[in-house]
Amino acid sequence: SERPKRVFNIYWNVPTFMCHQYGLYFDEVTNFNIKHNSKDNFQGDKIAIFYDPGEFPALLPLKYGKYKIRNGGVPQEGNITIHLQRFIEHLDKTYPNRNFSGIGVIDFERWRPIFRQNWGNMKIYKNFSIDLVRKEHPFWNKKMIELEASKRFEKYARLFMEETLKLAKKTRKQADWGYYGYPYCFNMSPTNFVPDCDVTAMRENDEMSWLFNNQNVLLPSVYVRRELTPDQRIGLVQGRVKEAVRISNNLKHSPKVFSYWWYVYQDETNTFLTETDVKKTFQEIVINGGDGIIIWGSSSDVNSLSKCMRLREYLLTVLGPIAVNVTEAVN
């Protein structure tokens, strides 16, 4: 089913309330057709992001390659009751309003529910899971052990992610919920240095309908890097938006696709995107069928007077005017 033509919305998800202490306010955000939480609250009426909420099983890095085990360390060892209880406490504490009707973002990035996708600094989750099975079945061969580890991990990873989402939807019924970063694409990456998503990842996304069926919004991340060429930056955005729209089109309820976009380069966070990069990445999101953009910012972008002044200047001269042009052109 094709997704109906929708209104294109841009949201402000930047902790600019931190600039108020310097007497700097960001009231102009709304003048640029950008949806902005009232009083510049970070968790507010239009959008609220919850970082690592509840008590998801995790291996929290300590010094010297050691880690602290939280709630069992891996999903198959975790206590879901404790997690869901803490999750609700977290929600009620950060954003008590049960009538919240904005976008609710669950930002959980410690592991991924597809076993294979836990590489890089997430590889510890694979190793930990494999060790558990090996201790239990010392005489199994490597292949059998890995298969069993993968099966157990994925079963409970799904349980944790699915139940968390269902609980969020149950307690904040009017909100539109989704997990930050999903669906993953793994394009413009060392092993897949092209705009198109990794083929295996696309197949895995198709198998993750249990997650996407429960989300009202899909929230791919399109942060770009300075090390890429301007064309490669566009390719990165294109592939990720396309994949999210593809997933949405395959679902009965066609969830909206809002791309998470950061105004600095991911590998050079003191440099704002050039005007051309802003225009082209925004256009790419529109062209490929996205429903909107969530402008994100880190607390370390706004933790000094000079940083706040720079961001304000950038909003007024570059980002704001482009946001107006894009929203007016589409709508």
UniProtKB/Swiss-Prot annotation:
One of its GO terms (cellular component) is extracellular region. It is found in: Secreted. Its main location: secreted. It comes from Vespa velutina. GO terms for molecular function: hyalurononglucosaminidase activity. InterPro entries: Aldolase_TIM, Glycoside_hydrolase_SF, Hyaluronidase, Venom_Hyaluronidase. Glycans are attached at N79. This is Hyaluronidase B. Hydrolyzes high molecular weight hyaluronic acid to produce small oligosaccharides. Keywords: Disulfide bond, Glycoprotein, Hydrolase, Secreted. Gene3D superfamilies: Aldolase class I (3.20.20.70). Disulfide bonds join C19-C308, C185-C197. The active site is at E109 (proton donor). Expressed by the venom gland. SUPFAM superfamilies: (Trans)glycosidases (SSF51445). One of its GO terms (biological process) is defense response. Belongs to the glycosyl hydrolase 56 family.
